[in-house]
């Protein structure tokens, strides 16, 4: 028996050594420390020798009666701390949870100007939350690619919310939010919201949200579908088109176009419904090509001082600019299209001043002379001039 047990122990020794050798790498791996961190640049990137005035938006804002705090990464929850008797307006279906005395909380469904907001495609169903004791609420959105941003309104600067669904929640007794109609943009982007007063705002954007701070004299060009909100300053944002390289080809004129336009056949053809339908189709194709192919050349120019909130993901050009605005910007010379408007206004002012100047000169005009005609007996007429100079 002793010999058998000795032989069994000798046969199991290789397995024991191999087992110890298998465990040794695991023990060595457990003793190693792996440290991973995100690299952060010390300074922002340079653009044409100047610092790009873009930074991340604020994650928290507070007032005497409330506090907004963005939680999570990438910013999936909004924590709202309310004092007693403070009202919180949040979009319907965005309330996640609430901590505090639930018996003191009152929640009602509020309709905020449903007629005007429905016409402008702005959400008008909001949940009004108030409590007689301090509470803390968590708010989120249904979309997984949105980012929160909080704005503190101190009453000195008003804001314009460019996106219809960007406003998520707000609080403040003196805060006023009024829908505004912007006819310069397309039907889907007619609705803007003007925010005035004091309070806190919670905005959401598609992708990541960034804040662009402009000083006096600085300019910033942004795509209109990327703009979430901006401060209301003068002058207002203007359409802008970048310059492009143009290769002009001069073809000698043979007068063929003028001859064809003067012919009766072309004149009669232009009055037919078929010709008008063809022109309308060509207009649609031209506008579509400008939106899809050259749509990256249509931007908005902001002049400082101003603060602009931009989002990393944007909508289509067709949802931002109307057909008329696309064609006007594309047909205008490169640069700021506001110059053409200023020239037209100046020309109109000159036309109004010319008749006024003529009317002013009428009372000052006086008779400088007088002519007297006399008929002689032979039928001849003689003129004698008399007046001031004689």
From Swiss-Prot:
Q: Which cysteines are joined by disulfide bonds?
A: none
Q: Where would you find this protein in the cell?
A: Mitochondrion
List the GO biological process terms: inner mitochondrial membrane organization
Basic and acidic residues bias locations: 348-362
User: Main subcellular localization, coarse class?
Assistant: mitochondrion
Keyword Transit peptide listed? The answer is yes
Which parts of this chain are annotated as the region Disordered?
A: 348-378
Taken from the UniProt entry, a GO cellular component term is: mitochondrial inner membrane
Instruction: Extract the Pfam families matched here.
Output: AIM24
Residue interval of the organelle targeting sequence: 1-28
Q: Which UniProt keywords apply?
A: Mitochondrion, Transit peptide
Similarity comment: Belongs to the AIM24 family.
Protein's name in the database:
Altered inheritance of mitochondria protein 24, mitochondrial
Q: What is the lineage of its organism?
A: Eukaryota, Fungi, Dikarya, Ascomycota, Pezizomycotina
């Amino acid at each position: 028996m002793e010999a058998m047990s000795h032989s069994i122990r000798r046969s199991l020794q290789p397995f024991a050594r191999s087992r110890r050798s298998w465990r040794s790498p695991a023990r060595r791996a457990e003793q190693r420390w792996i440290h991973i961190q995100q690299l952060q640049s010390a300074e922002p990137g340079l653009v044409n020798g100047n610092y790009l005035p873009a930074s991340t938006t604020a994650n928290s804002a507070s007032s005497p009666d409330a506090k907004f705090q963005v939680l999570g990464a990438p910013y999936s929850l909004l924590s709202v701390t309310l004092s007693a008797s403070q009202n919180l307006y949040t979009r319907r279906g965005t309330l996640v949870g609430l901590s505090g005395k639930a018996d003191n909380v009152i929640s009602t469904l509020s309709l905020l100007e449903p007629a005007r907001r429905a016409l402008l495609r702005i959400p008008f169903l909001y949940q009004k939350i108030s409590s007689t004791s301090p509470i803390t609420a968590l708010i989120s959105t249904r979309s997984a690619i949105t980012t929160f941003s909080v704005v503190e309104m101190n009453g000195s600067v008003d804001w314009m919310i460019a996106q219809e669904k960007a406003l998520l929640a707000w609080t403040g007794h003196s805060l006023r939010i009024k829908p505004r109609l912007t006819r310069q943009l397309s039907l889907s982007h007619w609705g803007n919201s003007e925010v005035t007063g004091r309070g806190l705002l919670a905005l959401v954007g598609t992708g990541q949200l960034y804040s662009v701070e402009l000083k006096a004299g600085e300019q910033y060009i942004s795509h209109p579908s990327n703009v979430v909100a901006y401060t209301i300053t003068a002058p207002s944002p203007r359409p802008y088109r970048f310059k492009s390289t143009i290769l002009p080809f001069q073809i000698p004129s043979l007068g063929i176009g003028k001859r064809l336009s003067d012919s009766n056949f072309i004149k009669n053809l232009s009055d037919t419904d078929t010709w008008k339908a063809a022109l309308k189709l060509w207009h649609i194709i031209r506008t579509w090509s400008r939106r899809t192919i050259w749509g990256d050349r249509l931007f908005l120019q902001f002049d400082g001082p101003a603060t602009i909130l931009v989002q990393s993901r944007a909508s289509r050009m067709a949802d931002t600019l109307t057909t008329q605005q696309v064609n006007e910007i594309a047909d205008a010379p490169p640069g700021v299209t506001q110059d053409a408007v200023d020239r037209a206004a100046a020309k109109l002012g000159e036309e109004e001043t010319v008749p006024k100047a003529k009317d002013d000169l009428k009372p000052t005009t006086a008779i400088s002379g007088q002519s007297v005609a006399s008929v002689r007996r032979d039928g001849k007429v003689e003129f004698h001039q008399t007046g001031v100079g004689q």
